[in-house]
Swiss-Prot record:
Keyword terms, alphabetized: Riboflavin biosynthesis, Transferase
NCBIfam families, per database record: lumazine-synth, PRK00061.1-4
Protein name: 6,7-dimethyl-8-ribityllumazine synthase
Biological role stated in the UniProt entry: Catalyzes the formation of 6,7-dimethyl-8-ribityllumazine by condensation of 5-amino-6-(D-ribitylamino)uracil with 3,4-dihydroxy-2-butanone 4-phosphate. This is the penultimate step in the biosynthesis of riboflavin.
Gene3D superfamilies in alphabetical order: Lumazine/riboflavin synthase
Gene Ontology BP terms: riboflavin biosynthetic process
Pathway membership: Cofactor biosynthesis; riboflavin biosynthesis; riboflavin from 2-hydroxy-3-oxobutyl phosphate and 5-amino-6-(D-ribitylamino)uracil: step 1/2
Phylogenetic classification of the source organism: Bacteria, Bacillati, Bacillota, Clostridia, Peptostreptococcales
Pfam families: DMRL_synthase (PF00885)
GO cellular component, one term: riboflavin synthase complex
Residue numbers binding 5-amino-6-(D-ribitylamino)uracil: F22, A56, F57, E58, A80, V81, I82, F113
Length: 153
């Protein structure tokens, strides 16, 4: 029996990070977590490229451009969509989720969904580096693991 599993070694790998400016305070915290994870796992700073987009809805397009460029071993999407009084949250969170997944499947480059979809700002803050850890850090670790796992096939 052969078992495939991605390693958490990233020497020489290059990652693109896309961050939504909407809810920038949260996005910035997620970005810090992602950069920390990449550096801790051996990614050189010059192999990390960051693109800021207006909001989560714009992420799939830039993710597709990054993934199709073949410059990156993985792309990490970070941001926060926080529920408000209108159905806008449902539309945005659904479409960005589908868009990110579709880019990954189409390009065969790991495109990692690190976009928080929360009911409150407090929940987002908790997931951006306080009580619930930093989901940006987790997304970066996932990107490293998936980039290495894909090399096995």
């Amino acid at each position: 029996m052969r078992v495939y599993e991605g390693k958490l070694i990233s020497k020489g790998q290059k990652f693109g990070i896309i961050v939504g400016r909407f809810n920038e305070f949260i996005g910035g915290k997620l970005l810090s977590g992602a950069i920390d994870a990449l550096k801790r796992h051996g990614v050189d700073e010059e192999n990390i490229e960051i693109a800021w987009v207006p909001g989560a809805f714009e992420m799939p397009l830039i993710a597709k451009k990054m993934a199709k460029s073949q410059k990156y071993d993985g792309v990490i999407c970070l941001g926060a969509v926080i529920r408000g009084a209108t159905p806008h949250f449902d539309y945005v969170s659904s479409e960005v989720t589908k868009g990110v997944a579709s880019v990954s499947l189409e390009t065969e480059v790991p495109v990692i969904f690190g976009v928080l979809t929360t009911d409150t700002i407090e929940q987002a803050i908790e997931r951006a580096g306080t009580k619930a850890g930093n989901k940006g850090f987790e997304a970066a670790v996932t990107a490293i693991e998936m980039a290495n796992l894909l090399k096995e096939f």
